[in-house]
Amino acid sequence: MSAKTNPGNFFEDFRLGQTIVHATPRTITEGDVALYTSLYGSRFALTSSTPFAQSLGLERAPIDSLLVFHIVFGKTVPDISLNAIANLGYAGGRFGAVVYPGDTLSTTSKVIGLRQNKDGKTGVVYVHSVGVNQWDEVVLEYIRWVMVRKRDPNAPAPETVVPDLPDSVPVTDLTVPYTVSAANYNLAHAGSNYLWDDYEVGEKIDHVDGVTIEEAEHMQATRLYQNTARVHFNLHVEREGRFGRRIVYGGHIISLARSLSFNGLANALSIAAINSGRHTNPSFAGDTIYAWSEILAKMAIPGRTDIGALRVRTVATKDRPCHDFPYRDAEGNYDPAVVLDFDYTVLMPRRG
């Protein structure tokens, strides 16, 4: 192999405390927004309508929280997970400055944990990634951990360091960029009359609708984020792999589930935090994705009576409607149809 090409990092290439500045900065355009909308059909009013966003004190319609996440995440793939077997989870994700078309995002990651697996062939790398805009304002930070192959199974194992991971992002750490006026908040345009006050802890919502994944669409979405993980693209190689076909990028499932959640959570303006997330089973083209959500917590935001926070678990399934809320069995094992277990916090207007 030429020394000028990049094979990606293997487990033994990572060092505790290592900082990685990822290529390439990305200016988000109106075209990116249009393509994202065409891929997922998101109907949330905040990111669809500039007048609606302006009624909440913003200058115009912002970039969808998850489009920000995917672009920040995509920057990390060539350095962190090009040789990954699996992306294992997320924690401590916090959205910061509002992102608008024309903003340029870049990402830096720090290795905060390493643990070699017992087989000696792989290890788990924990990274804290930070995305910033052109003014170095943090737009997103999160922790993720990923299982990565070793180049040499005989390479010595590093000292095991597993970081303490937060259970959730405290409400006091949430960025709340909106100001809601009951007189100006248009429930008809938002798509639902149900606000923060109308949800109860433990309430479960079947989002009803399903959407089938197309091969071209999931690959186009992954390219949109400049995510280069070969398992999503290279059928020539993956045909001989564990599944015999390309795997759908897990973030594609997150965005599909968020879009489906409009039916039941239409006033969830944006995602303020990612508390945890697991891709519990792989998804493939031809799978039909359904979703349901549970309200885990209702949180009043200190000093605010116009807006509150809901901690939500959204579960996505493949080829299985969610009228009976499939999740885990008595032993804690996931239903085989569950492909995503996503715990996040949304901002939602309160009744005046």
Swiss-Prot record:
Keywords linked to the UniProt accession: Carbon dioxide fixation, Lyase
Subunit structure: Homodimer.
MaoC-like domain ranges (all copies): 16-129
Gene Ontology BP annotations: carbon fixation by 3-hydroxypropionate cycle; glyoxylate catabolic process
Organism name: Chloroflexus aurantiacus (strain ATCC 29366 / DSM 635 / J-10-fl)
Molecular function terms from GO: oxo-acid-lyase activity
Lineage summary: Bacteria, Bacillati, Chloroflexota, Chloroflexia, Chloroflexales
Protein's gene: mch
EC assignment: 4.2.1.148
Positions contributing to substrate binding: 62-65, 85-88, 96-98
Catalysis performed (reactions): (2R,3S)-beta-methylmalyl-CoA = 2-methylfumaryl-CoA + H2O
One matching Pfam family: MC_hydratase
pH dependence: Optimum pH is 7.5.
Stretch forming the signal peptide: none
Induction remarks: Under autotrophic growth conditions.
Name the UniProt record assigns to this protein: Beta-methylmalyl-CoA dehydratase
Function of the protein: Involved in the glyoxylate assimilation cycle used to regenerate acetyl-CoA and produce pyruvate as universal precursor for biosynthesis. Catalyzes the reversible dehydration of beta-methylmalyl-CoA ((2R,3S)-beta-methylmalyl-CoA) to yield mesaconyl-CoA (2-methylfumaryl-CoA).
